[in-house]
Structure formats: C-alpha cells, structure tokens
C-alpha cells in the first residue's frame, strides 16, 4: 500500500508542477517588455498645416535602439487594437510640383506615407505655377523656391519674351527643364534683377520694370529661399515666356528655367439692327469685340425665332488690333422693309477659350424701317429753299455749289418742324442765291449708317448784278490800279535819285 500511495503522490505532484510551468509561461508572454521602433501620432495631436507632417502621414520617431535580433527597424507594434498605426510605405519623389512647403527629411531614413501634402521639391528650383492662364487685367503671382539660395550671395534675374518672338527661341523652351550655365537668349526684356547696381547698362528693361518705373508693373517679394514674382496686370504685352536665371553674384546664369504666362479675355457682344429705308432688305450686325486668344467664334442667327441657315446671307470677318481680336458678323434678310413688319434678330455667339471651356451669349434687337423722304427745291429772288418731309430727328441739310466738293459755309440756315409720324420731322434749309454758280445740291446728312445718300439737284442761272454795285466794284478796281502805278513810280524815282547821288559821291572821292 505504501509504494502505491507514494507513486500516486509523485504523479499528482508532477501534474501540479506542469500546470504551474504553463501558467508561468503565459504570464511571461503577456507581461514581458514590448520593443517598438517609434511612436504613433494621433489625429488630435497632428501638427498644423504650417508644420511638417500631418495626421494622414504621421512622422515616425525612434524611441529606443532596438535589438536587430528581436525587432525589425521602422516596424511599429500596435498598443491598442481599436486604432492600429499604419506602417509608412516608401514613396518616390513626385513628378508634379507641390502646392505648399515640403516636409523635412524623415529621421532614420524613414519615408513618410504618401498623402496630400507635398514633399521636398526635386532639383535646384520648384515653382508652383509653370503655365498660369489668367484673365485680362488680373494680377498673377508665381512662387518659386530656390534650393541652397541661403548659402550663397544669391542673385536672380527675370527676362520676358513675347509669345511669338522673331526669331523664335531656339531650342524650344521646356517648362519642366532646369538649364545650367546658359545665358538668357537674345531678344528678351529684363523685368527684374535682384542686384540692379550690377545690371549691364546696355540691357533693355521692359515697360514698368527697372529702377524708377512709375508705376511698377513687376515686383519680386518674399525671403529666401522662396521668391514671389508678381505681375500687376496681365495684358497682351505682359504675357509671354519668362526666363528665370539665378546663381551667385559673379555667376548669375548658373541655373535657368522657363515659366509661361498666358492671357485670356472673353469677347463682349453687341447687336446692332440696321435702320433700312423702305425697299431695302433688313440687316443686323453682331460684334464680338476685344477677345483673346484667337480661338474660333461661332455665330448662330435667328430671324423672328427662325434660324438662318443660308451661308449666303451671313458675312463674317475677323480683325486684329492691339487689345486682341474682333469678329463682326452681318446677316441680310430676304425680307424687304415696307413690305413686311419689322424683323426681330437674335445673335447667339459661342467662343471657345480652350477645348473644355467656352462662353456663350445672346443679343436681340428690332430692325427699324424709315420712310423714304420727298425732297423739294424752290428758287426765289434772293434765296433757294430745300425741304425734306418726315426725316429722323437730327437729320439736316448740307449744300454744295457747282463742282465744289466742300459744303457751302456760313450760308445755310436750317429749321425743323413737326411731322405726323412720331420721332420724325420736316427739315427746311435756306441758302442765298449765288452769282458764281448755277448748280445746286442739297444733301441730307445725319442718317444712320447703311442708308443710301439722299439728295436733290437743281439748276438756276445766276442773276445779273446790280449796275450800281458793278460801278462801285469797277471804281474800286481802278483805284487799286492807280495806287499800284503810283507806288511803282515812287520806287523808280527813288532808285534814280540813289544812283545819281552815288555816282557824284564817287567822283568827289577821286578828285
């Protein structure tokens, strides 16, 4: 019995010892120290946008030197299952320029997770806007960050080239390329030099740039390494290719890069229905004025809500001027004024700024039909009178005599009387009879453009002059002739006396 009891006790003791060992191992695994390579930044503790890092891309900071045999570097161990940290994934340098201050280089060669915040710009320069498109008259700002500019005596020059230089810039500029040891191409105008006292005196400054520019059109602001080029007003003259050259004071062309500034200006739309005379076809003109660039302008015409499809009725022309381009479109109706009611014209203009954006505007106007006036001319004893009935207010007469192309001056007297039609009046003009001309023309002036010339011709023989008046004129003519002869005689006598006295004086001196 004793050996059996002893064996049973040994078995029970072994089972207890084994259970204690298992429990101890579990406690050691759960309570042993956990080695981590970094701390997790919560969203509530994320730095502001002005500081490096963000909640979306936490910065991994080592807290201890891990044992390479027990832990892998840059690997984090979660402490709370509800909010596990994300393991940062290595990212390559982005090709597109960032839009804010780049993050500093992470510690321990750890690359932060890719997020919406920009990273450190590659290359010696980074510009936030390489190809801005701005509205006419607006203000443009281009921000560039120059690497290592605070470690040297930095000098920056900016040159402007027109959009279509002649000869063109060779080779063609690449907006993403950074050039080295390349001087500014010829044909440019200098808009900025951070060291104006070192500028070549033969350099041509752009309008609104350089020392003494009033008002200044260009400015560069901001502390290094970031510089902001500000163009006060974008116009066809200020748009173009801008070449930024920088380097040391003694080597300002160590680096160079291109920035393009483009302008757009939507057209303004006006519709002018033509005033037509009875018997003339209706017309209307639509003008898309002062737009840029010269992208296609499309006109759709409607006459009394019916679209005009016949291309023979529409004439469209484009004109270039310093402020841009203007397109004029004129539609001619098949209907004639006086035979049908006045027509209502609608012009729909579409201008494509680019392949995606366009402007569309409408304008409507009613055509005006004017009655054809009746012009009469009456000759009196001393005056000739010309009358035109029912003409628009503001219309008057101009008189022409014979073949003289200039109007008769200081002789026409104009009066207006009311007419039965609203907005119309009867015009009467009086001109004294001429003793030198027999042909008279009275012409109506002041009609809207497009109205044909309206005039009346008349003939009248010059009346004989008054005998008394003729005698007076002849007497004046004879008096003038007598005065001329007398003056000539006095001059002759004076000359003779002078010659005689001169000869006598010479003879005395000889003696």
Curated annotation (Swiss-Prot):
Residues 137-151 are annotated as: Heparin-binding domain. Keywords: Disulfide bond, Glycoprotein, Host-virus interaction, Immunoglobulin domain, Inhibition of host complement factors by virus, Membrane, Signal, Transmembrane, Transmembrane helix, Viral attachment to host adhesion receptor, Viral attachment to host cell, Viral immunoevasion, Virion, Virus entry into host cell. InterPro entries: GA_GC (IPR001038), Ig-like_dom (IPR007110), Ig-like_dom_sf (IPR036179), Ig-like_fold (IPR013783). Residues 267-359 form the Ig-like domain. Residues 43-80 have a biased composition (Low complexity). Residues 25-480 are virion surface. Residues 1-24 form the signal peptide. GO terms for biological process: adhesion receptor-mediated virion attachment to host cell; symbiont entry into host cell; symbiont-mediated suppression of host complement activation. GO terms for cellular component: membrane; virion membrane. Pfam families: Marek_A. Residues 41-130 are annotated as: Disordered. There are seven external glycoproteins in HSV-1 and 2: gH, gB, gC, gG, gD, gI, and gE. Belongs to the herpesviridae glycoprotein C family. This is Envelope glycoprotein C. It comes from Human herpesvirus 1 (strain KOS) (HHV-1).
């Amino acid at each position: 019995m004793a050996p059996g009891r002893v064996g049973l006790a040994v078995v029970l003791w072994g089972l207890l010892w084994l259970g204690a060992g298992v429990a101890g191992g579990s406690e050691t695994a759960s309570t042993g120290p956990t080695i981590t390579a970094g701390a997790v930044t919560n969203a509530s503790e994320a730095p502001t946008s002005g500081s490096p890092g963000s909640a979306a891309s936490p910065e991994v900071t080592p807290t201890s030197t891990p044992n390479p045999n027990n832990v892998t570097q840059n690997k984090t161990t979660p402490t709370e299952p509800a909010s596990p940290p994300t393991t940062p994934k290595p990212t390559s340098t982005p090709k597109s320029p960032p839009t804010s201050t780049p993050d500093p280089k992470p510690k321990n060669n750890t690359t932060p997770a890719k997020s919406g915040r920009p990273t450190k710009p590659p290359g010696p320069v980074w510009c936030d806007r390489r190809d801005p498109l701005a509205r006419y008259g607006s203000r443009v700002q281009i921000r560039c960050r120059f690497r290592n500019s605070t470690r040297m005596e930095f000098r920056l020059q900016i040159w402007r080239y027109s959009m279509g230089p002649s000869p063109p810039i060779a080779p063609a500029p690449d907006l993403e390329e950074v050039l080295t040891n390349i001087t500014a191409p010829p044909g440019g105008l200098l808009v900025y030099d951070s060291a104006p006292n070192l500028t070549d005196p033969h350099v041509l400054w752009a309008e609104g740039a350089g020392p003494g520019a009033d008002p200044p059109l260009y400015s560069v602001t901001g502390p290094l390494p970031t510089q902001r080029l500000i163009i006060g007003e974008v116009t066809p003259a200020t748009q173009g290719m801008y070449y930024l050259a920088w380097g040391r004071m003694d080597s300002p062309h160590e680096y160079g890069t291109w920035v393009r500034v483009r302008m757009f200006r939507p057209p303004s739309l006006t519709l002018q229905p033509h005033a037509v005379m009875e018997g003339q076809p209706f017309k209307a003109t639509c003008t898309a004025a002062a737009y840029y660039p010269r992208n296609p302008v499309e006109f759709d015409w409607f006459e009394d809500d019916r679209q005009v499809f016949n291309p023979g009725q529409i004439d469209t022309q484009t004109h270039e001027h310093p402020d841009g381009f203007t397109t004029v479109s004129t539609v001619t109706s098949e209907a004639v004024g006086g035979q049908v009611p006045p027509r209502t014209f609608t012009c729909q203009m579409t201008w494509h700024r680019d392949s995606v954006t366009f402007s569309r505007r409408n304008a409507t106007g009613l055509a005006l039909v004017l009655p054809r006036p009746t012009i009469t001319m009456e000759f009196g004893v001393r005056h000739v009178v010309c009358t035109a009935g029912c003409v628009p207010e503001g219309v008057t007469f101009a008189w022409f005599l014979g073949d003289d192309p200039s109007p008769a001056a200081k002789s026409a007297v104009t009066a207006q009387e009311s007419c039965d039609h609203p907005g119309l009046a009867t015009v009467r003009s009086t001109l004294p009879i001429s003793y030198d001309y027999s042909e008279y023309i009275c012409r109506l002036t002041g009609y809207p453009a497009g109205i044909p010339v309206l005039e009346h011709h008349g003939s009248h023989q010059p009346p004989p002059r008054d005998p008394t008046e003729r005698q007076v004129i002849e007497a004046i003519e004879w008096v003038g002739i007598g005065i001329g002869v007398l003056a000539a005689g006095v001059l002759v006598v004076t000359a003779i006396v002078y010659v005689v006295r001169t000869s006598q004086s010479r003879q005395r001196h000889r003696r």
